């Protein structure tokens, strides 16, 4: 391969092959500049419907539309060359029927160039996952806390404690057997997450789950300290970009009001020194 050959992007088969190996690294991204940063370090870039909350200021993910996912999906695709690009299917775009799910998944892939879609739900979505996979659409599943079902679940609660553990385990087994290439475990207790990881043949990707999952995912704006409306227990802040941005904007505003910006090096003289071009 020559030095100028394009980098082969990560694909579903590559993710499957990582089961039980080095942990998979996944982050969300919503813009081209951030996608470039994520692409340099991660195996999977997820255009999550969390964009509704962290980018558009919505109270939940329920108001996210296909058009929003496509807009941000295109932007992230422009900044992604190596990582596997996965896009969330928004609420209402896949639950009605497998045919509806296929039509919208096909649209996401065709218009953004993503490599896979992600959808929420366990046993009740297994038939839809199988329908998509049989028609050439790789699917990342999502069980445990499924934010699109927040109203039915009674809030953003941990899923799978006590007698509820069997339900979450059965959901994970069902989506794996349906052909999903990986499954996100969200807000699932540590021990149960480990048992699911040992039980299913596909990689588990934890968010508020266990360090023993096959990979981890976080919302980029959470881990960078950009989204500060609330902070889930499972989020570790690896930066405080929100604070840094606030300080930078405050400094800019102060300099403008004091007429210290723009300074001489930021403006153009009336005449050029020396020979005219």
From Swiss-Prot:
Membrane-spanning ranges: none
EC number: 2.1.2.11
Binding site for Mg(2+): 49, 88, 120
Binding site for 3-methyl-2-oxobutanoate: 49-50, 88, 118
Reactions accelerated catalytically: 3-methyl-2-oxobutanoate + (6R)-5,10-methylene-5,6,7,8-tetrahydrofolate + H2O = 2-dehydropantoate + (6S)-5,6,7,8-tetrahydrofolate
Keywords per UniProt: Cytoplasm, Magnesium, Metal-binding, Pantothenate biosynthesis, Transferase
Compartments reported by the entry: Cytoplasm
Protein biosynthesis recorded as keyword: no
Active site feature: 186 (proton acceptor)
Record-level Gene Ontology MF annotations: 3-methyl-2-oxobutanoate hydroxymethyltransferase activity; magnesium ion binding
Cofactor: Mg(2+)
Keyword Zinc attributed: no
Co-factor remark: Binds 1 Mg(2+) ion per subunit.
Membership in a protein family: Belongs to the PanB family.
Subunit structure as annotated in this protein's UniProt entry: Homodecamer; pentamer of dimers.
PANTHER family: 3-METHYL-2-OXOBUTANOATE HYDROXYMETHYLTRANSFERASE
HAMAP family on file: PanB (MF_00156)
Name of the protein: 3-methyl-2-oxobutanoate hydroxymethyltransferase
Species the sequence originates in: Cereibacter sphaeroides (strain ATCC 17025 / ATH 2.4.3) (Rhodobacter sphaeroides)
Gene label: panB
């Amino acid at each position: 391969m020559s030095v100028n050959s394009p980098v082969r992007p990560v694909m579903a088969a590559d993710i499957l092959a990582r089961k039980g190996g080095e942990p998979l690294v996944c982050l969300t991204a919503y813009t081209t500049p951030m996608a470039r940063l994520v692409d340099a370090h991660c195996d999977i870039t997820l255009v999550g419907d969390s964009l509704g909350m962290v980018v558009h200021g919505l109270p939940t993910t329920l108001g996210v539309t296909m058009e929003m996912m496509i807009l941000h999906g295109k932007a992230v695709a422009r900044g992604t060359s190596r990582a596997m690009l996965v896009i969330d299917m928004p609420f209402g775009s896949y639950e009605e029927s497998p045919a509806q799910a296929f039509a919208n998944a096909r649209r996401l892939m065709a218009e953004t160039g993503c490599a896979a879609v992600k959808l929420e739900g366990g046993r009740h979505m297994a038939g839809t996952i199988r329908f998509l996979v049989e028609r050439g659409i790789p699917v990342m599943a999502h069980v445990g806390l499924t934010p699109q079902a927040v109203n039915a679940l009674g809030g953003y609660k941990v899923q799978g404690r006590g007698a509820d553990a069997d339900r979450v385990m059965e959901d994970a087994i069902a989506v794996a057997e349906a052909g999903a290439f990986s499954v996100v475990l969200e807000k699932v207790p540590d021990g149960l997450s480990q048992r699911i990881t040992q039980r299913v043949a596909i990689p588990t990707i934890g968010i508020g789950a266990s360090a023993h999952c096959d990979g981890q995912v976080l919302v980029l704006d959470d881990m960078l300290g950009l989204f500060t409306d609330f902070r889930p227990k499972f989020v570790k802040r690896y930066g405080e970009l929100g604070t840094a941005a606030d300080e930078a904007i405050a400094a800019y505003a102060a300099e403008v009001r004091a007429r210290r910006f723009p300074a001489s090096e930021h403006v153009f003289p009336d005449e050029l020194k020396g020979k005219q071009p």
